[in-house]
Amino acid sequence: MIITSLLDTDLYKFTMMQVVLHHFPAASVEYRFKCRTPGVDLVPYIDEIRAEVRSLCELRFTDSELDYLRRLRFVKSDFVDFLALFHLNEKYISITPSQKGGGEIDIEIKGPWLHTILFEIPVLAIVNEVYFRNTQRRPDYREGRGRLREKIKLLGAKPEFADCKIADYGTRRRFSKVWHEEVLRTLQDGLGPQFAGTSNVYYAMTHEITPLGTMAHEYLQACQALGPRLRDSQTYGLEMWAKEYRGDLGIALSDVYGMDAFLRDFDMYFCKLFDGARHDSGDPFDWGERLIKHYEENRCDPRTKVLVFSDALDIPKVMQLYARFRGRCKLAFGVGTNLTNDLGYQPLQIVIKMVRCNGQPVAKLSDSPGKSMCDDKAYLAYLRQVFGITQPPDDDAGK
């Protein structure tokens, strides 16, 4: 089976799940899958995907896994006690051929947020690995190793980049579990202190790597339905995060409503309270310049703040960003697909996004065209109006 541990997922799933347990235990949600890569036929693999998901739903946390989570400073004992009883339930997920045809499949996850939040990452990893093990039966690992060595060589070649560190954010779109582990071992050996950590909790535990992550888009999206007022939903989400973590895990995600709306809400209080922010769509150079200026305008020294970049990075882009911003702020880089699925084959652009919470539509208004997903065009238009965003919905909206 592909997934053999419930820790084989991103850390931010657990940090968000703890907030859900303590503050939103009754919330119900709906997620949907989308493959953005045109011409991909996933229908022949539905039975394999279902079998892997069935196996996923049989997993439980082991005592050693629970002990590991308990040792993380921000994980609370009652959350670990809850996880000791937890398992994913197959009744909350359906996988069917899409009525649209064209080889598309529908994956719908629907149920209590607390009991569905851990589906996304392993299900995406399953879809990816099932697809590639059927379409690339003899993977060119030699090519993959060569490309990985070149990346390590490039990052380590110049002394002025000695403090430039990267982290692995590639679980969801990895070529395979076996390849993911080899990549991590190679990065550990080849980069040394320039390898900052991984978002994958299982490999963080088994390879003694620093686990990394705070919040994802789904958390701030859900707050559209959970907060007192839609216009205040981003502020509400950040305040509830601070209430749970009291200054820990202080990286705010900036692109749920776009950078303009984020900067309006990210006032002096949040500038001082949060350690930094994460970029995940739009022009990263423009984003960094605007955020640094925003900190200065709010009487915060940007050199004390962390700018995290995680949108479709490769090593040359990391180095360009580092060269632009080094010395002006603290920097962190999360590299995903370019590390864990670069063997010479076209990676699948697959996502699972929250589309409803408590029966109400929720949406992300990304800084990048094509990244938004919403099944309700009227709500998307209303959301843009509320947050003062003038650009029209992108092609993914309402699909």
Curated annotation (Swiss-Prot):
Molecular-function GO terms, alphabetical: nicotinate phosphoribosyltransferase activity
Family: Belongs to the NAPRTase family.
Described function: Catalyzes the synthesis of beta-nicotinate D-ribonucleotide from nicotinate and 5-phospho-D-ribose 1-phosphate at the expense of ATP.
PTM sites of type Phosphohistidine: H217
UniProt superkingdom: Bacteria
Gene that this polypeptide is encoded by: pncB
GO BP: NAD biosynthetic process via the salvage pathway
Catalytic activity entry: nicotinate + 5-phospho-alpha-D-ribose 1-diphosphate + ATP + H2O = nicotinate beta-D-ribonucleotide + ADP + phosphate + diphosphate
Protein name: Nicotinate phosphoribosyltransferase
Entry-linked HAMAP family: NAPRTase (MF_00570)
